[in-house]
């Protein structure tokens, strides 16, 4: 029900056989403040990562601070081997950024370590270094175009 609080272990839904889908999947939304689509947030910021992993959130921006939409970003671990991790920044208008973070991308279940965040665009490579710690949201910002 709208406004209902949930705790770890609460059943939120059950799998059924109604509707049309090509395979099992879950639609999960987090809504903050109001029960409408304009209040959605990225659920990866609200879900605990897998044990011994962290979450990376950040911003990919132009030199004037404007968010860049659908920019590809990857994480390369510098201090040891790690699984390939990549995503794109949000499309314009969705999902909505967290009102405190103002992020435009999130990656979950990232193995802890020292990483280089990489955005390649227009034949140029932009990087930022970050440490990823387990059990928390780790932050990085890349300015593209300087």
Q: Where in the sequence are the language-model features?
A:
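Short Pro-Gly-centered beta-turn/loop motif in secreted/extracellular proteins
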Residues: 97-116, 120-123
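A short, amphipathic beta-strand motif
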Residues: 56-62
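Conserved, short, structured surface segments that act as functional micro-motifs
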Residues: 2-55
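Surface-exposed loops/turns
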Residues: 22, 111-112, 134
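Structured interaction patches on ligand/partner-binding surfaces of diverse proteins
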Residues: 121-146
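Beta-strand signatures of extracellular beta-sandwich domains
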Residues: 29, 72-76, 118
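Short, ordered, surface-exposed loop/turn motifs in non-cytosolic proteins
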Residues: 62-90
């Amino acid at each position: 029900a709208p406004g209902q609080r949930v705790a770890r272990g609460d059943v939120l839904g059950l799998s059924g056989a109604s509707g049309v889908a090509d395979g099992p999947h879950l639609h999960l939304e987090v809504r903050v403040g109001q029960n409408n689509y304009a209040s959605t947030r990225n659920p990866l910021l609200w879900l605990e990562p897998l044990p011994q992993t962290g979450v990376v959130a950040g911003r990919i921006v132009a030199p004037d601070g404007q968010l860049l939409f659908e920019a590809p970003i990857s994480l390369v671990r510098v201090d040891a081997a790690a699984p390939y991790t990549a995503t794109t920044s949000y499309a314009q208008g969705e999902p909505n950024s967290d009102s405190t973070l103002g992020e435009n991308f999130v990656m979950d279940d990232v193995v802890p370590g020292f990483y280089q965040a990489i955005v390649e665009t227009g034949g140029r490579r932009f990087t930022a270094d970050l440490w990823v710690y387990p059990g928390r949201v780790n932050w990085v910002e890349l300015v593209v175009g300087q």
